[in-house]
Amino acid sequence: MSASKRDELVQNALKAFYTGGFHAIGMDRLAKETGVSKTAIYSHFRTKDDLILATLRLRDEQFRNWLVRRVEALAKDPKDQLLAVFDALAEWFAEPNFKSCMFIKASSEYQDRSHPVHAISAEHKKLLRDYFTDLAKKAKLKKPEDLARQILILKEGAIVLAHLHDRETVASDAKQAAQILIKTATE
């Protein structure tokens, strides 16, 4: 299988896992949904978990690149960019194929913290927190690490609530809470 076919497999597997879950999608179903035989899948991925890790790496890259681009397009000032995170989330929540966060799902299906799937999910959240810390430092806000952690908590809570039932208002509600946190960090 060529690199482009492998990449296509990872992209199609990402879609299957995102919509169907990790444990619920067996290799037979995955082969059917991706159009790739199990033999071909196993020629590139020793185990299903290896394929899952590849999809999570791809999703991490896609999501963080998308978020940074959207935030930078929505606001220029670092303080405003912290708030623009929630505007970007509102756009994501409005997409018809929104199915929550792949990393929240992965960590809930692989709860053992030492499992590589759980670890890559935790790393994704750490990288987002680092991005928020960087913005808070650029904005010269007080206790930037604490603020970044709080912004991350609001973001993650908004994702869960948007998934459960409240897509229309949850991002703006989280943004209002973030405004209070940022105002406090400014004073």
State what each model feature region is.
Residues 57-64:
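Short, basic, alpha-helical segments at the C-terminal edge of helix-turn-helix-like DNA-binding modules
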Residues 126-142, 164-187:
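C-terminal peripheral helix-coil segments that are non-catalytic and often amphipathic
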Residues 54, 68-95, 138, 148-151:
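Hydrophobic alpha-helical connector segments
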Residues 61, 80, 113-138, 149, ...:
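Amphipathic alpha-helical packing segments from all-alpha helical-bundle domains
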Residues 95-116:
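Amphipathic alpha-helical segments used for helix-helix packing
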Residues 1-4, 186-187:
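N-terminal intrinsically disordered/low-complexity leader segments
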